[in-house]
């Protein structure tokens, strides 16, 4: 049975997409793409490091918002910190996109790495207002 059949039957299945030195695209692998695009619900775990040692970047958040099937995103940093973003029962897509756009505007005005992190932090500090739970351990 191939991956598409297993996904369609709702069986548990894992797709792995490897990144490069400068980025990671969780759906760059065919199997991972099929999982995200055809599953009713899925969890994406991203293992990567950001230069600032931050957890979620705006690119990570954009991925979470883009795919309705992704209900949880987990980031494990190079220092072993684990952070979660979970779409809760009160998740409001339109409000989440508006909050994301606020963060992107701040990001576009950033002059340095600290400014870029501040933009991502803006989303993370306010995401509970749009039904997304954030936890960092």
Label the model's feature ranges.
Residues 10-29, 83-89, 98:
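Short amphipathic beta-strand/extended segments with alternating polar/hydrophobic composition
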Residues 1-16, 73-76:
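Short beta-strand scaffold segments in enzyme catalytic cores
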């Amino acid at each position: 049975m191939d991956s598409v059949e297993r996904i369609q039957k709702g069986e548990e299945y894992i797709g792995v997409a490897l990144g490069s030195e400068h980025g990671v695209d969780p759906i760059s692998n065919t199997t991972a793409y099929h999982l995200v695009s055809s599953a009713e619900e899925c969890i994406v775990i991203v293992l990567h490091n950001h230069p600032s040692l931050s957890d979620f970047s705006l690119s990570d958040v954009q991925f979470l918002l883009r795919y309705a099937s992704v209900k949880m995103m987990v980031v494990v940093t190079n220092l072993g910190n684990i952070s979660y973003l979970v779409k809760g029962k009160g998740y409001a897509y339109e409000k989440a996109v508006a909050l994301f756009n606020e963060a992107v505007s701040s990001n576009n005005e950033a002059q340095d790495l600290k400014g870029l992190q501040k933009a991502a932090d803006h989303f993370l500090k306010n995401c509970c207002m749009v039904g997304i739970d954030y936890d960092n351990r």
